[in-house]
Amino acid sequence: MKLVKYFLQKKSVTILLLVLVLGGGLFSYVKMGKLEDAPFTIKQALVMTPYPGASPSEVQSQVTDVLEESIQSLGELYYLKTENRAGLSKITVYVKKEIRADEMQQLWDKLRRKVNDVQSKLPAGAGPSVVNDDFGDVLGVFYGLTGEGYSYRELENQAKLIKNELLRVKDVAKIEIYGVQSPTIDVILNPSVMARSGITTADISRAFDAQNRVVDAGGIDAGVNRIRIESTGNFYSLDDIRNMTIVSRTGEHFRLADIAEVQESYQTPPSNKMRINGQPAVGIAISTIPTGNVVDMAEAVKLVIDRFTETMSEGFELQTIYDQGYESAVANQGFILNLIISVVTVVAILLFFIGFKNGILIGSGLVFSIFATLIVMLSQGIALQRMSLAAIIIAMGMLVDNAIVVSDSALVNMQRGMRKRVAILRACSSTSLPLLAATVIAILTFLPIYYSPHITGELLSSLVVVIGVSLMFSWVFALTQTPFFIQEFVRRPRPDELKAALFAGKYYDKFRSALRWVIRHRYATIGCMVVMLVLSAWSFKFIPKVFVPALDKQYFTLDMWLPEGTRIEETDKMVMDMAAYIRGQEETEMVSTYVGRTPPRYYLSNVSFGPQSNYAQILVKCKTSKLSRQLHARLQDSISLKYPEPLIKVNKFELSPLTEAVIEARFLGPDPAVLDSLVGQAVEVMRRNPKVADARNEWGNMSMIIRPVYDPMKAGALGITKASMMESVKSINDGLPVGVYRDNEKKVPVLLKSGNVDITDANSLGDFSIWNGERSAPLSQVTERVETTWEFPQVRTYNRQLSMAAMCGVKPGHTMAEVHGEIRKEIENIRLPEGYTFFWDAQYKDQGEAMQAIAKYFPLAFLALVVILVCLFGNFRDPVIILCVLPLSLIGIAVGMLLTGFDFGFFPIAGWLGLLGMIIKNVIVLIDEINVQHRTGIDLYTSIVEATVSRTRPVLMAATTTILGMVPLLFDVAFGGMAATIIFGLTFATGLTLFVTPALYSMFYKVKGK
């Protein structure tokens, strides 16, 4: 107690330290980062490898498998998933969840080396591979640029000017431009003119190669100087290309413009497209440096953009699509308001229970604990965000609990006639160790979450740290600031004010009577509790299970897939029509569409799809979050009825990454046909369940392909190679690259395209003329046949095994756990041939991994808890009593979940762990008080009764402050379930502390009731 004495005697030091805490807390609040949600690390990387002309199966066997063999030697590898489409290998590398965030960059460097080591083993024409390890970066400030009457090229140029301005803004890390259409120079050949002139495509290719090649012209010596000679002839304008000379086989010279049309165009088919409210657009997505403040960065960006828009040409318009800075500021303001309401509520309750002066005394300790916690948060780089602010609110009741116990004990000692300082020191000495043990145990209950390597553990890590730090500060201030304030501001009762009986009155008498009855009927009481526990466990089957709750935002998204093989232009038409329909709803403020692939990751938990020509995403911004909920619910029910052809998913924003489907039954094996059969059976099971939505095969529908089967004999006689045949075919639509046009710093490909052709099927393709440089022949004369066939548009693997999944969603009003439970047995009973395996993927796998990650550290937390309790009490019976109380907390939780209708998931589980800490804290102090009174010579029965009576006021105060302090969180979509868990659980736990604990104590110590 020397520390307590020091702070009581050294007033100046105490006041200075408290002022420093207040000043440091205010400074920290101003300086610390502000975020919308807690950051977490996406422990994935993408390896993309082009292989033009290869089928999905060829990509998988010749490219992907080679890369996977090298990558799998990474010791940190968890598993690999691949998606192989025509001409493109896409490998997603998942690393072990135990890998720390600060080790990720070194790991990605190792991955790059593994990928680079096998580039020489890839087939000719494949590669190079690109390792994308920053696709998890958040570009949270997202603008869209539109320009009525402007081309995509002009939009791109304007976006680049804006990008150059924004890169100079403080805390801007990188800027990505989305929706840019790659420019081309199309040389559209006229077959009839070429036939008359004798010009072939080979002649044109040779001319481009000769003129566009960069040649070193050397230099000349001029006295003491060496003067470099610059080669010319490069293309710098369209006229340079049009005026290029083409020499025919007969030696005649022609201008290219005489035999072909030269025009500016864009890549066909485009890789992606973006629109805002139906207008063509390009996106400008901006990320913050890791140590930056996104709120400040977003405000600085807005100032630059506001200034820049004043100088833009008329017609250009910049619109905010998503502003993480604004969203963070709004979220912080909402939570700060909730925090203020909680603090005011707690202080008001204290004033009601113990009067103005004592209430302010204890309430001030709460403020000091919060401000000291802010200092630590700043020093540890913990930003103000949803989790850290919620942690302070969750810890609110526990923060005042220590001060309540110390001050109540000191006040009781003074009522017993002790001098003020003696009463304070006696209170601190008798409660410091039990309160420290209880505080440490309350922190230990969160240990499994803190050490969980899963994303959910990382998501909640700041919540655990803030709760732990604030609880320790509450203990420190309870033994320093609280005694000091009692000494300075609380008057010692006069002799005539001393009470003969401290806990007298009709309410105390009624409580004593009830307590004595419980002790007399302890076995019946405990039996009733056990029955209630069994009933509550049974009632959990009626509580919806949703692992991570959705967020309440103005935004939601729609993901749309048309049948595989759909042209991107058709996808764009469909999504434009759908966006126009959504834009016509009264709740809508803005609609932006993204065709071909998802936009940059403007929100951390967003999922990436694409490149896929049949895919599109719609981002809907509503006028308010309430209207967003209304429109989201309505579209869930109606959008698929209005647009039956595509698969449509309507998604709310969530705290953790979404999976491609809610439920995935994944089959692994060597034969795609067998996998297709197994998945078909699983899909049929899903479709029979009325709660299932959009049951489908992960590989999609079979796509039509046209296959010209090259005939070496026939083609060889005509001198036509397979390469020249395929190059000619490519010129029909995509275009054959023959040169480069230099447009400032950009190199624009020059493409040869065949004009006046109308090819839509195998028959018309067979009539198309193929050139060999000397002559032409119809395609049908150089092939065995031109056939139409079908193929899977993609081939997927899991850990180097062919992998195919039956996927489905869940209809509104139902949950994954509910539907999975209904279809699980039948799908698991599907007979698997030898060599084939099955497992549940997606949300089921993710949730199982999260729970396993938490359960992994439960034994450690439990062992630490038991060791502390045994060391504190010096016996086994008291710890066993405490452990027997803990399961009974589920009774209150079950009642709360059923009454409020909240889903039970990861956050309520975290709330339950915190609740256990609160219960343990109360029971420790109660049992310690029983033991203290018994050691003074009071019989054990009386000690049980009187100790419980003496703890009634502090227990009720702590419980009431916690319960009412949590009320603001009840209305938060993310934390409502957690708040309900603590509120109802603690309400029931208060009864456990005051009635069940004495009953258990009397039973374990064989104390007879009177």
Model-derived segments and their meaning:
Residues G25-K31, V344-L411, V469, A864-R951, ...:
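Hydrophobic transmembrane alpha-helices and their membrane-interface caps
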Residues L16, S55-Q62, I99-K110, L139-F142, ...:
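Solvent-exposed, non-transmembrane alpha-helical starts
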Residues M396-A410, T431-Y451, E458-L498, I618, ...:
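Transmembrane alpha-helices and their membrane-interface boundaries in multi-pass membrane transporters
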Residues M1-K34, T431, L498-P549:
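Signature of alpha-helical transmembrane segments and their immediate interfacial
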Residues S12, L20-A54, N116-P123, I449-E458, ...:
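Transmembrane helices with small-residue packing motifs
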Residues Y6, D37, M48, K90, ...:
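Extracytoplasmic/periplasmic membrane-proximal domains and adjacent transmembrane bundles
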